[in-house]
């Protein structure tokens, strides 16, 4: 059950998409949605100013003041976005309701945005993040740090209408622990989907028989949970381009992709594998990830 959903807000327009997605996903589970804004603490702003000074003609003091003003503006915009969301969807359910449905609250704190978001995420069932806007607070490397550090599934929401998220779900399947854990974490969503499509992909020239059979086996296992499932084995190019898998998912009508997040080594876990890096960069579907 997805009872606790964390939505980190950045003060960019795509915050609204993240909140809408959390509402769509959380409403059937009567979820509590926490909108979290981590306002950068003074030392974070000073450090950011020091980094930017190398490429700026402004003095360090001017940069600090500019970054402080921007952070304050982003915090105000994040709160406005949450207030609009709450008024639109949840005002009647602010303290729960006999008819069920989601509830939500705003929380603001001062600190390190990535570290404190990661810490807060450990107390949630799902983290919903908007894909980074240009200059946004959670670019790909920050998403990776949150994903690896929190131990919870992360739903990355692109700039699309989130209204139908999860009605048709595609699974990027590989017979690895990461993919198996992602499927398990996504079971509450999979159980509500109209259709679940299991997709597996091989490098160019590789025999697809074994991987296709693995996908079919997963589809059969999910079908025993009452899900309508199908499986497809895809032949890819030399680099196993995720665009092939994404294209097939969209062709089949998927509006959510479930995938495991793979890293190259346990010693250096912040180095994601090529497929994970590519799918983080290229996926224009809502993306449910677990490391």
Where do the model's predicted regions map?
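Short secondary-structure boundary segments
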Residues: 37, 131, 260-262, 291
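Small/aliphatic-rich secondary-structure junction motif
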Residues: 1-64, 165-234
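Short, small-residue-enriched loops and turns at beta-alpha junctions
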Residues: 135, 204-209, 236-239, 265
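Charged helix-capping and loop-helix junction motifs
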Residues: 142, 212-216, 245-248, 271-276
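Structural beta-alpha unit
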Residues: 40-43, 50-53, 69-127, 224-257, ...
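Intrinsically disordered or low-complexity boundary/linker segments at protein termini
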Residues: 1-20, 24, 93-101, 105, ...
């Amino acid at each position: 059950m997805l009872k606790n959903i964390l939505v980190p807000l950045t003060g960019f327009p795509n915050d609204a998409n993240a909140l809408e997605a959390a509402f769509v996903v959380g409403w059937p589970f009567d979820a509590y949605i926490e909108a979290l804004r981590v306002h950068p603490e003074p030392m974070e702003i000073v450090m950011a100013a020091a980094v930017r000074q190398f490429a700026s003609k402004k003095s360090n003091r001017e940069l600090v003041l500019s970054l402080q003003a921007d952070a304050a503006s982003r915090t105000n915009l994040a709160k406005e976005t949450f207030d609009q969301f709450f008024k639109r969807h949840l005002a009647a359910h602010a303290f729960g309701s006999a008819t069920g449905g989601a509830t939500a609250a705003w929380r603001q704190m001062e600190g390190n945005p990535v570290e404190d978001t990661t810490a807060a995420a450990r107390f949630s069932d799902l983290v919903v993040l908007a894909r980074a806007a240009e200059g946004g607070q959670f670019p790909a490397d920050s998403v990776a740090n949150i994903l690896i550090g929190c131990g919870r599934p992360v739903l990355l929401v692109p700039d699309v209408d989130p209204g139908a998220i999860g009605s048709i779900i595609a699974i990027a399947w590989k017979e690895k622990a990461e993919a198996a854990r992602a499927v398990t974490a996504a079971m509450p969503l999979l159980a509500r989907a109209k259709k679940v499509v299991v997709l597996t992909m091989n490098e160019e020239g590789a025999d697809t028989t074994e991987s296709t059979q693995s996908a079919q086996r997963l589809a059969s296992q999910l079908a025993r949970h009452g899900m309508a499932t199908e499986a497809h084995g895809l032949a890819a190019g030399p680099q196993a381009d995720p665009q092939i898998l994404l294209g097939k998912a969209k062709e089949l009508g998927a509006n959510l992709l479930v995938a495991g997040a793979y890293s190259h080594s346990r010693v250096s876990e912040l180095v994601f594998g090529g497929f994970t890096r590519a799918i983080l960069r290229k996926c224009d579907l809502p993306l449910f990830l677990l490391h």
